[in-house]
Amino acid sequence: MKRAFKWGSIIIVCGLIISGIAYLGHKQLFDPMSPIEESTANRDVLTRKSFNKIKVTASSADVIIKQGNHFTVSYYGNKNHAVHAQVKDGVLKITQTPVTHSKLAKFQLLNSSDEERCIVTVPQKASLTKIEGHVNNELLLNRILAKKINLESNNGDINVLNSEFDQGKIITTSGDITIRNSSLIQTKLASTSGDINLNKVSLTKGCSLLTSGDFNGQRLTIIGHYSVTNQSGDNSITKSTIDGAKLTTKSGDNNLKRKHRSGGSLERNTTEPNFIYLKNVSGDNIIK
């Protein structure tokens, strides 16, 4: 009886150790809608100089560019993966110490319960001429005006809230693109392995490209010609302002208002100036 109890205790202890390691190695999910806590604990203010262009490269930190009271760049997280910021000739350049594979394993075991975040604040009336961001994790822009953007994430999502861009591109390799309450002019959206989700967005020209994800649009306003091209996901648009549309798919269904067709194409008011074209290979097209 004592022997069984002893073995049972050992199994329980081992289970607790494994659970603890799994917890420490698991990074908390990034929620773009949650309030951003900016306590002074473990915070480094990198610069307070003004700028009109941003060029950021981050190997492991989430990057947040948002409206604030002043020009500020702050970093919260592990100092071994420190973020560096420099302003020269109006250009804010942000870089981060790369994380090697050996350091990454140790970091995940001991420190990954702590979030790594680089937060850039821009005053309300400031308009940026260009934002260039190349990150490995999450990227969030909130209440930002920019003439040109070039945003890319390898393994994280890109979220845009309450912002206006005149031209550019937003690209994810393995993550979603989510845009809400924003205006995009001549902007290309592309996702290799993720969804594109738009809600209350004005789209002036431009396009969306997907390989293996869904395009979800709600309450969109289409100005000029806009196209959505998908390889193996569904394209869905609801409650949107669209004058004309064309839907094509090789091995899926087309649903345009009350019209339905398997494969082939459906179209409506194709000569209208504000027009959207949904192209698909092996997925459905839906406009309600």
Show where each model-derived region lies:
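Beta-strand-connecting loop/turn residues
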Residues: 52, 69-71, 88-92, 147, ...
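Short, surface-exposed interaction patches in beta-rich subdomains
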Residues: 177-288
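N-terminal Lys/Arg-rich, disordered targeting/topogenic segments
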Residues: 1-3
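Alpha-helical membrane-targeting segments
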Residues: 101-113
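Edge/loop elements at the starts and ends of beta-strands within beta-rich repeat scaffolds
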Residues: 47-49, 122-127, 144, 163, ...
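Short linear S-[DN]-x-LW-Φ motif typified by the pepsin-like aspartic protease active-site region
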Residues: 26-97, 113-130, 138-150, 158-159, ...
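Right-handed parallel beta-helix
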Residues: 130-181, 188
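Hydrophobic membrane-insertion alpha-helices, especially the h-region
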Residues: 6-23
